[in-house]
Amino acid sequence: MFRNSVLLAFGLSISFSGFALAALEEPVPGQQVQAVEGARKINPAAVEVLLDNNRRMTLDFYGDNIFRIFRDDKGGIIRDPKAEPEARILADNPRKPVSRLDVDQKGDAVVITTGKVRIEINKKTSLFKVINLKDHSVVAEQASPILFEKGKTSFSLKAKPDEYFYGGGVQNGRFSHRGKVISIENQNSWTDGGVASPTPFYWSTGGYGVMWHTFKKGQYDFGSREENLVNLSHDENYLDVFFMVNDGPVSLLRDFYQLTGAPVLLPKFAFYQGHLNAYNRDYWKEDEKGILFEDGKRYKESQKDNGGIKESLNGELNNYQFSGRAVVDRYKAHDMPLGWLLPNDGYGAGYGQTDTLDGNIANLKSLADYARKNGVEIGLWTQSDLHPKPEISALLQRDIVKEVRDAGVRVLKTDVAWVGAGYSFGLNGITDVAQIMTYYGDNSRPFIISLDGWAGTQRYAGIWSGDQTGGVWEYIRFHIPTYIGSGLSGQPNICSDMDGIFGGKNPLVNVRDFQWKTFTPMELNMDGWGANEKYPHAFGEPYTSINRWYLKLKSELLPYAYSIAEESVSGLPMIRAMFLEYPNPYTLGKATQYQFLYGPYFLVAPIYQETRADEEGNDVRHGIYLPEGQWIDYFTGDLYEGGKIYNDVDAPLWKLPVFVKNGAIIPMANPSNNVSEINPNLRIYELYPHGSTSFTVYDDDGVTEEYRAGKGVRTLVESRVDDKNNVTVTVHPAVGDFNGFQKKKATEFRINVTQKPSGVSAKIGENSVNLAEANSMEDFKSRENVYFYDRAPNLNRFATKGSDFEKKVISGNPQLLVKLGAADITAAPTVLSVEGFRFEPAEKHRLSSGALTAPANAAVTEENAAAYTLKPTWDAVPNADFYEIEFGGMLYTTIKGTEFLFEDLEAETPYSFKVRAVNKDGHSAWTAVSAKTKANPLEFAIPGIEGETSVENQGSSLAKLFDFKEKDA
């Protein structure tokens, strides 16, 4: 589906057929037509195009496939965009060599050619075509001349009928933009449809990308008004745009990173949960409606002196349970993972109560030392200047150098009051912090969580999605496509608050949020502003046990997560849209917006709404698209054939729908509460052998910038199943080195099976390992060079002792466990051989026998038809286990009821369906159903209405009354 790509600065359409040089269309009357008088090469990487009226346009090449178009009709020369305060979008070294740069005139066109692209400019109209020389396809074509208006520049490109568009930054609730318009604007809007961290960059499946080189807001319309046009504009009075031409998403993202910098690789502790609150300002007074503390009493918090106990960072004033230290101990007492802590909120809290800045720094250092002793790093919120100002009181003074150098701060979270202006303001601030953290922090890797980002933010910081309200399903729903879209925009490091910063008091939403975010980079408990305390144990059982389970699972998956995080620095993001691995018409749009791939092997389908939930939160999930191939339920081991859309997938409260691709190789670690608890002398690989597969595991010191200099270790792991059902797993010698690398490690394999293999053997280099069979799990754990057949692995390993949930039996599919003694993993390959391998789970869906008749009375009744939804119904069929519907070329399967809702349809459009019954003997004949959606309820609404109020808008902009978005009503 992906064509070779070019990043262009003009309105270009994507077209793939051959074309004549004179075939560029005439411009629309009234637009600013410019004739081309000539062109000349002004240096080895740039061409100046001379237009009539003594105007000039520069094409500056940053490589054979990336060029910049600059035009300022007021006479300005090529330059960086204006930035106050100073900031740069481009990385320090954004250029690559240009192998050739030729300028010719052929007929009615000026032709500019490099080793990879050809740009043809019509002399009469100055309209462009950009051709990828790899296959001579037109990847972008300008549809109309550049239009300069007062404070605004725009142009348009042609769009192909099968072309899709992605990017634009954190566009809440969206990732696929075909037929839509997106704002490249810092709206500080944290809900669906808003823009949290815009990026002036998009790319197309047609093979090109565009990045506007500006700090001004803009708008990109991908055919919302004119189906075959892409209209682009920014509030800038000159044109400065980069075009990239390349083959597919990874290549285009790499082009973007070449220009603006690669995303940061988060330190390892960042993958553990963080806790954020203020512990240096408030007063706590006993109140029966307050929060329950360890002394058995309830207290309410106040920012004003209410006669209660004043909190502090270190609990030295007989206020321990209200201190920052108590947070560290509280997580430990509840056996909950915690990687980092922010003890100030930046809004009047500070981090000390002395009358000098140095005294407060010492107070912060005391907490940091205590936290690090317990494996936890310390960070700070920032809503004010980073450097000392004499006019500010000691309480609120900041000195980022001393905070990093003396107190050991290793995390920084920006806030609206500091970077809320966005654009260059936000980029300037995090640039300063990143450099200080590395320089004064012993080459520490910066861990910055920012908001209001822009192009270039990714090279310094991850992104936070803003202040949202928890306790509601909408909070989970819109974040799923938001996270996907962030990765497609070149920002793979995205996070949001666990169950929101505000609201709460809904343990079911809380648990479901912890579950799906296990398969995301970062987790933040933003405490102190919600309806309940924001701890993973806040709601008691069974929620505490389930949250602990998923937090421990996240820690076990760190080697996998860290490997795909390193890949995201120059390749695919960690959280992947389905089309990145499985491009087809179904995945390219928004049909799969509520599921994603976590790296190459995990498919995650979060519970984002109540479908058929009982009072305990046990539910089902509809609409899970499993691509071609075989997929395995990560918890139960059930096998699913791909190429279908599964429905009524069981999701009891403890279970997140997660599927593993058959053939997966998953590097793991021992469960831990922080990085210090990871066993550096053990490596674990869980495998689902199928065909021939491989995975490269990446590791480094996890804390410094040395990875940028290549200080890291890569280990290739291969798995192969032969035609005799014998498995060979080869762990190749580790390649590379880093400070602290432990070469001598034990190796553990977890092979998923459905019956005990007939033979197990292992070799390290040329030496065979004498394996013994363990007679129990305890025996296996206590020895080395052993194997054990675990018939029913206990998945419920982390329940609270004595809780009812601890008694719940949750078993997975059988596993063959193999543990080899420590050896030098750089010296020789480790090879595991398994004879008589079987992974053939019992059928769970097709259980009944008997003849099946075609479903009767299949129809969409009047009450089941709406403008954007249709719900076919039918009569139950005897002997049926489930039903299938064919719709839009896709097969919807495992439908347990006799109705099914189709959403996101077009108004006043006819649709056809086919329904059949299924059991283990086969399926019935199809029954056809036809229906038409009803009229658009906004059909006669008048577009373009604007309004104003005589007083300041409260909560939301008045524009939401007129924006045609029903969710804003």
Where are these regions (language model features)?
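N-terminal accessory segment at the very beginning of proteins
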Residues: 21-268, 307-310, 314, 321-323, ...
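Short beta-strand elements bearing conserved aromatic residues within extracellular beta-rich modules
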Residues: 883-885
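Predominantly extracellular/luminal regions of secreted and cell-surface proteins
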Residues: 676-695, 937-964
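Hydrophobic core positions of the immunoglobulin-like beta-sandwich fold
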Residues: 900-903
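Catalytic-domain carbohydrate-binding cleft regions of carbohydrate-active enzymes
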Residues: 24-29, 136-656, 661
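Pro/Thr/Ser/Gly-rich low-complexity, intrinsically disordered linker/stalk tracts
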Residues: 846-878, 907, 925-938
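Short beta-strand segments within Ig-like beta-sandwich modules, predominantly Fibronectin type-III
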Residues: 561, 891-897
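Beta-strand-rich modules
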Residues: 905-921
